[in-house]
């Protein structure tokens, strides 16, 4: 989501030249968002004002005494007095070529208008005509002289144009040859980009057995609701019109409360006395299912204590197709299975507290550039174009697992998918999410991602957030009273509204929120904090001027205490999410009793802005700046830090013996600053975030994958000079995603590298735990670290410049995300997906592959609905019942469901339905259960092996299972994993299973999951390229 920005606005700037755009690193030119000043256009043509200053003719202007009069060229016998004057001269064509653009416009205008003297409307007299002829002849001579001076330039242009034509011809010939060669080469897989299909009507919820009781309760409540109450529940009341970032209206008659929706995936945004947990990318790096769930439990507990009904997380989109994507850090990694497992465990943890979780952003929200039109001054958001197979096997996979985890809400994303806005894309919401995946909860929009009223309702959207329509805080909603009117005039069927509100109420019952204390005035429930002020007393409707206020902050401490303190789980996740990438001669772990190699006091240098606290963790709104140690990215997915333990603070008390420590908390250091040190600790980072904030020249998405703020230079300088070349340098990276480190990773002075990701509030403590070996280095990469951004392939590049009025991003190779692309093209990465060193060693052995079921090509026929969905009376109420009640005083900009008049409420034959609205849709054969057909999740294969700790200390190993399909598939794909802890010499059996879906692909022809014929190779190992064990099935 994004907050309103007063600088948003403008129009599509497709007329900007390449050299007009803001610059980025490596000399590239980039498109700038509207938050920053837009440079003036540099044009090869001058403006009219410039013509007036340099090329205007005072006789032609006559001090503005001439005006233009329309001429009927068919009925008038008067010709322009100006035209014969020109045509009587010699060299007319040369003259016309040389005159300025303004004069050409005047000549063109003269063909349609007569020049008339305001002082005398009669024709020119002979003296005036002669004078004008003389002056024009003189001007023509000067023009010819000027033209002769430009002859060399003219010939030079001709030469260059000829050369360009030859080059273009050669390129076309070569391209044609290559195209012919490619077209005659065997290409087993083709990914056609087709517009999004339609899928109507929106499937009704309440068809799965484990939701039956919740839907029965919801049906009883909804039956007693009025039309305006139903609309009130589906529409937010407006940005800053309640205490939370999102607030629905209540249904007072049936005692259904207003719901509080609050960010986000890292904890509670805009709240006091809450925890700043490690980011999703750090959590994914743990590869620890138990920690993933425990973190979710703690997040859900804090949301419950603060009175939040719906927590807007976890994030599983973006998936990380683009390694420079600005919000990748909110998710768990660049693989659908890793992302799915972490998301599902987080959801189970959050919802164990009765708080509704939100799976977001559905789907293909892979970059920040052009995700919203008003952020970039373009007509509409970009379109992410993806094939059906990649959509199912990659991007929708985590959402399917989230639905299996019983997630209550799904948030649709900002951008378009196959040129249909995600929040009204009926194929996505109706066809895939609700029908095929059996989603029983409600679909909410991202904040202002709703782009239509009727189409979004029919397309499957159930809740509009924050209620505002196309603009922030204007009090004009696409739903609210407009939805009331649309239902009354039958353009939106009342059955659709009934399903929308029933889904929301059923989710409320499903999480047991009907047992929560009611909010004021009936009780003391509801949110006990304000998103808009830290003061105890504040406005109830901050976005309005109504002046109503109350106690809004009760300062409830939700962080837990003692052994239940959430700082404990935050520290564990941050430590286990730290990845050891390099460790020469067992430089790590450090000894707390260390001394200098010469036997004296250990001399330690600490380098880099990232080591220190700088201005504090909350110095910039939504963490929108890179200063001090980096513990989170920026945007709506972050939180207010209760505290932040920086590395420099934690290191002050890390050694048991006396040491000599010197801190250089800056990125510009001199070689002399390192020459007398035994140990050099270098802290560097790379930041990014949501697109509504620009910081350090980064407009959401990173410009490249290099370290920021001179980090690469800092590492090279320190490592080359530490101890006069004899010292040991340890590099600690805090980053939102992969960083290219080719300029220093192989330097002999770099002895160890730790990737600490985004560790949250316990940053320094968790780092010290790993540095000194209190915790094993057990993190594993949740993405591939390539040697360059180009290694990830053309399909993984952020679109930084709009390539059309509606920017188009074609995910042609989306099936080959991250390590799959590296494997497909045999590219050697710097560090592969799943890689990570440990302080001990492990051995994997005795692999056993056992079939649990016989292979079969496809799933059985789709099972019938287990339960019939609710049925309601569909008669419409008296439109007058939807009017504002007599004497009602509306709050300015607050969004109500009431009508101010009855215009447009009469039923009529609405004829502007989306394409395909009247076509009957066949239920997906891949549906029938939560997450899809129940048979997809049957266990097909058992994988057993022995894991032995062959080192001299306790440690944790991540055992990863990959599957190689028969030909025409990615080389291998992750399908399962587990993490175990072993004492030295301990040996233990590990067992995992593979489901039918794990061994199937999505058939675009059959629109179903199909298990291919042939043998599967099942690989087991420590990373995507360290797979010592292999069996077949």
UniProtKB/Swiss-Prot annotation:
Listed pathway(s): Glycan metabolism; cellulose degradation
Highest taxon listed in the record's lineage: Eukaryota
Q: Name one GO biological process term.
A: cellulose catabolic process
What are the glycosylated positions? 224, 232, 418, 489, 528, 593, 909, 918, 976
Where does the protein end up? Cell membrane
Taken from the record's topology, the Extracellular segments are: 183-1033
The residues annotated as the active site are 446
What UniProt keywords are attached to this protein's entry?
A: Carbohydrate metabolism, Cell membrane, Cellulose degradation, Glycoprotein, Glycosidase, Hydrolase, Membrane, Polysaccharide degradation, Signal-anchor, Transmembrane, Transmembrane helix
Q: Where is this region: Disordered?
A: 1-71
How is it placed in the membrane, per its record? Single-pass type II membrane protein
Q: Where are the transmembrane segments?
A: 162-182
Show the disulfide pairing. Answer: none
| Ranges of the Cytoplasmic topological domain | 1-161
Q: Which InterPro entries match?
A: Cellulose_deg_GH3, Fn3-like, Glyco_hydro_3_C, Glyco_hydro_3_C_sf, Glyco_hydro_3_N, Glyco_hydro_3_N_sf, Glycoside_hydrolase_SF, Ig-like_fold
Task: Return one GO MF term.
Answer: beta-glucosidase activity
PANTHER family according to UniProt: BETA-GLUCOSIDASE, BETA-GLUCOSIDASE E-RELATED
Recorded family membership: Belongs to the glycosyl hydrolase 3 family.
Name it.
Probable beta-glucosidase E
């Amino acid at each position: 989501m994004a907050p309103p920005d007063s600088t948003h606005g403008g129009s599509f700037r497709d007329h900007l030249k390449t050299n007009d755009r803001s610059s980025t690193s490596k000399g590239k030119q980039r498109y700038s968002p509207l938050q920053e000043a837009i440079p003036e256009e540099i044009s090869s043509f001058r403006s009219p004002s410039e013509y007036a200053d340099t090329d205007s003719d005072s006789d032609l202007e006559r001090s503005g005494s001439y005006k233009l009069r329309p001429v009927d060229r068919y009925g008038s016998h008067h010709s322009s007095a100006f035209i014969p004057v020109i045509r009587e001269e010699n060299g007319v064509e040369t003259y016309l070529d040389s005159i300025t653009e303004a004069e050409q416009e005047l000549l063109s205008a003269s063909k349609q208008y007569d020049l008339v003297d305001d002082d005398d409307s009669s024709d020119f007299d002979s003296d005036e005509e002669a004078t004008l002829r003389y002056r024009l002849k003189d001007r023509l001579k000067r023009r010819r002289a000027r033209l002769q001076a430009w002859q060399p330039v003219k010939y030079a242009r001709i030469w260059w144009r000829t050369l360009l034509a030859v080059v273009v011809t050669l390129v076309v010939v070569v391209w044609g040859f290559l195209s012919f060669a490619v077209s005659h080469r065997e290409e087993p897989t083709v990914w056609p980009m087709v517009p999004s299909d339609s899928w109507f009507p929106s499937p009704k919820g309440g068809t799965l057995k484990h939701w039956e009781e919740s839907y029965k309760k919801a049906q009883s409540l909804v039956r007693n609701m009025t039309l305006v109450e139903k609309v009130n529940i589906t529409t937010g009341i407006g940005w800053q019109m309640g205490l939370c970032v999102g607030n629905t209206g209540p249904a007072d008659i049936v005692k259904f409360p207003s719901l509080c929706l609050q960010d986000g995936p890292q904890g509670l945004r805009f709240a006091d006395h809450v925890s700043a947990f490690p980011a999703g990318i750090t959590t994914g790096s743990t590869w620890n299912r138990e920690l993933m769930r425990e973190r979710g439990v703690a997040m859900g507990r804090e949301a419950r204590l603060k009175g939040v009904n719906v927590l807007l997380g976890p994030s599983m989109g973006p998936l990380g197709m683009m390694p420079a994507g600005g919000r990748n850090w909110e998710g768990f990694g660049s693989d659908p299975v890793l992302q799915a497992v972490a998301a599902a465990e987080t959801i189970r943890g959050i919802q164990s507290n009765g708080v509704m979780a939100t799976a977001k952003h559905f789907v293909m929200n892979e970059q920040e550039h052009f995700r919203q039109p008003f952020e970039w001054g373009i007509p509409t958001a970009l379109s992410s174009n993806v094939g059906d197979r990649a959509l199912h096997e990659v991007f929708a996979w985590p959402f399917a697992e989230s639905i299996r985890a019983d997630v209550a809400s799904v948030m649709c994303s900002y951008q378009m998918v196959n040129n249909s806005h995600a929040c009204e894309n009926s194929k996505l919401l109706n066809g895939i999410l609700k029908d095929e995946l059996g989603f029983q909860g409600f679909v909410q929009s991202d904040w202002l991602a709703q782009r239509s009223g009727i189409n979004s309702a029919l397309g499957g959207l159930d809740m509009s957030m924050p209620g505002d329509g196309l603009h922030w805080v204007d009090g004009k909603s696409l739903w609210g009273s407009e939805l009331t009117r649309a239902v009354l005039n039958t353009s939106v069927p009342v059955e659709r509204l009934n399903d929308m509100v029933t889904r929301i109420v059923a989710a409320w019952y499903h999480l047991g929120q009907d047992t929560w204390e009611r909010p004021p005035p009936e009780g003391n429930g509801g949110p006990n904090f304000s998103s808009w002020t830290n003061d105890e007393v504040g406005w109830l409707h901050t976005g309005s001027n109504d002046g109503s206020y109350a106690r809004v902050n009760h300062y409830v401490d939700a962080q837990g205490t003692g052994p239940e303190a959430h700082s404990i789980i935050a520290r564990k996740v941050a430590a286990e999410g730290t990845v050891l990438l390099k460790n020469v001669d067992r430089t790590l772990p450090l000894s707390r009793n260390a001394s200098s190699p010469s036997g004296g006091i250990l001399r330690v240098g600490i380098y880099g802005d990232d080591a220190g606290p700088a201005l504090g963790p909350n110095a910039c709104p939504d963490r929108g700046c890179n200063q001090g140690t980096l513990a989170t990215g920026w945007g709506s997915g972050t939180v207010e830090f209760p505290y932040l333990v920086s590395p420099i603070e934690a290191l002050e008390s890390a050694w048991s013996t006396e040491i000599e420590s010197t801190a250089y908390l800056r990125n510009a250091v001199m070689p002399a600053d390192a020459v007398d040190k035994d140990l050099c600790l270098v802290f560097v980072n790379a930041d990014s975030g949501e697109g509504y904030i620009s910081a350090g020249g980064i407009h959401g998405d990173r410009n490249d994958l290099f370290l920021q703020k001179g980090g690469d230079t800092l590492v090279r300088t320190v490592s080359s000079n530490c101890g006069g070349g004899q010292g040991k340098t340890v590099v600690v990276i805090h980053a939102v995603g992969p960083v290219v480190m080719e300029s220093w990773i192989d330097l002999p002075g770099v002895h160890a590298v730790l990737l600490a990701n985004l560790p949250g509030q316990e940053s320094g403590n968790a780092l010290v735990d790993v540095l000194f070996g209190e915790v094993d280095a057990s993190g594993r990469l949740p993405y591939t670290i390539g040697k360059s951004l180009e290694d990830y392939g053309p399909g993984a590049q952020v679109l930084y410049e709009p390539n059309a009025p509606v920017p188009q991003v074609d995910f042609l190779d989306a099936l080959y995300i991250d390590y799959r692309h590296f494997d497909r093209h045999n590219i050697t990465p710097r560090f592969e997906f799943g890689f990570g060193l440990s302080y001990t060693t492990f051995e994997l052995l005795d692999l056993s592959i056992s079939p649990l079921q016989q292979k079969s090509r496809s799933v059985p026929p789709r099972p019938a609905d287990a339960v019939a969905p609710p049925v309601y009376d569909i008669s419409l109420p008296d439109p007058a019942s939807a009017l504002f009640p007599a004497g009602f005083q509306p709050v300015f900009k607050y969004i109500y469901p009431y009508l101010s008049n009855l215009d447009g409420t009469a039923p009529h034959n609405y004829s502007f339905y989306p394409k395909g609205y009247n076509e009957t849709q066949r239920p997906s054969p891949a549906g029938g259960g939560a997450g899809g057909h129940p048979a997809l999740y049957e266990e097909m294969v058992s994988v057993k092996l022995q894991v032995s700790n062959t080192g001299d200390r306790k440690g944790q190993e991540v055992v990863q299972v990959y599957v190689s399909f028969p030909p025409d598939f990615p080389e291998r794909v992750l399908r399962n994993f587990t993490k175990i802890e072993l004492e030295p010499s301990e040996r233990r059996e590990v067992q995992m299973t593979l489901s039918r879906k794990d061994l199937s692909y999505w058939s675009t022809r059959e629109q179903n999951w199909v298990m291919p014929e042939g043998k599967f190779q099942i690989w087991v190992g420590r990373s995507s390229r360290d797979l010592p064990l292999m069996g077949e099935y």
